[in-house]
Amino acid sequence: MDRVSTTLDQQHAAPTGSAAGRAERAARARATAARLSAEGVDGVVLGWVDNSGITRVKTVPVRGLEHAAAWGVGAAPCFDVFLVDDSITTSRWIGGPAGDLRLIPDLDRLVRLAAQPGWAWAPADRYAQDGSPHPGCQRQFARRSVAAAERRGLTLRAGIEVEWVVALAGPPEEPPVYPTRGPAYGMDRVTDLSDYLRDLLRAFDQQGLAVLQLHPEYAPGQFEVSLAAEGPVAAADTTVLVRHTIRAVSARHGLRVSYAPAVEPGSVGNGGHLHLSLWRGERNLGQDGVGPYGLAGEAESFLAGVLAELPALLALGAPGVASYLRLVPQHWAGAYQCWGPENREAALRLIPGPSGEGPGAANAEIKCFDGAANPYLAVGAVIAAGLAGLDARLGLPAEVTGDPAARPSGEVPRLPGSLEQAVAAYQGSEVLRAALGDPLFEAVLAVRRAEIELFAGHTPQEVAAATRWRY
């Protein structure tokens, strides 16, 4: 296994400008760099995900890892207000050409990239020049949410399903040409792309990623990989790494990849379903309780808080104009603000798990999130919403079984059907503003408004074409 550390979700003290802090980080990085160099690694990618859902990077030679860990690598604050097309907006707190931040690699999550010989990758946290946490750092926001749960004696385990469409390589303006036309979920797709899928499994394994399933999905050329649950920040890191890996393996096979919510309008899109379970000690609060389907009271209140905030959460979990080409009824996208046991049309699907499988089986799935989401924003905001529900001792409404679209109109509330509607809910969410803090909250708001304006008047086909190869 190539990951330097298998730590799931460690909490890190914020690095400071102290000589002792820099020396400690430098010593760890020096040892890590020596090991990487001996393994043939020449460069290290430091990555973070911006508010439009795009992974941005800086790279350093392996000999520069020590300096990067001690002092950071410069990056402009304006990355917080980049749009999906690389244009830049501004917000009340963040934007403009002035200022600089430091990217500090998380050495506990550094991994040698199996599909990119000579390269390693590490997620980066962003700090101000004085060593204080950057208020717009999405990864540190997720960590703060985890810490807020831990102060209540609670821990969470999470996993994000990664769905993607694979197509033959070609110019970015061209629509996808699929390398397999086999049936949805069909063995033909595995046969047609056998070597490709095998190389993916090998790369995941070499990087220490615990794959649960890899299988064809519904849309043309679509596949899904799901991984074992881990701490929420680690799960977000894993999602970024998995996407990198899929893209790298695909390129080696003459293929290109889209994680976009809508690759082709009218077809099933790429989801980013978030699975969460809430724990107190060794007890999974999603089972063996006295609430609905075995939920403990704390788990019910947590999920009720998530359900109540889902319209606002969509601005983070379904963040693009294209997201609402995917989020439609009767596509298993979770377009209704309801919950139900094993209901794939509900935005919040309760998964009790097979009887007798063990305490790790029960979890909840948020189905309305998609592949455009920044995973750190998604997990951090969902935790914040759940904790607000727990603090308010909310209860779940009546469950919904079957297809909500088959109910009388208005009986089951629809989630926002456009980014404009989601942004309106987000703007009014006191829970999310308090959790994210004004600088991050406002930066997200600025990006969403700017992308709404960017795609104003575009047809669904034009929106899909403009975003298809951006994610």
What are these regions (language model features)?
Residues 212-232, 238-248, 316, 454-471:
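Long hydrophobic alpha-helices with heptad-repeat/coiled-coil character
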Residues 226, 231-232, 324, 342, ...:
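Intrinsic-disorder/low-complexity, polar/charged segments
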Residues 178-190, 228-236, 285, 290-292:
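Glycine-rich tight-turn/loop motif centered on a GG-T
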Residues 56-57, 169-170, 224-226, 270-272, ...:
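Short secondary-structure transition/capping segments
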Residues 157-168, 175-177, 184, 207-227, ...:
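Core alpha/beta catalytic barrel or barrel-like domain that forms the active/cofactor pocket
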Residues 2-213, 411-471:
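ATP/Mg2+-dependent ligation/transfer catalytic cores
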Residues 19-22, 26-35, 42-43, 47-150, ...:
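Active-site capping/gating regions of soluble enzymes
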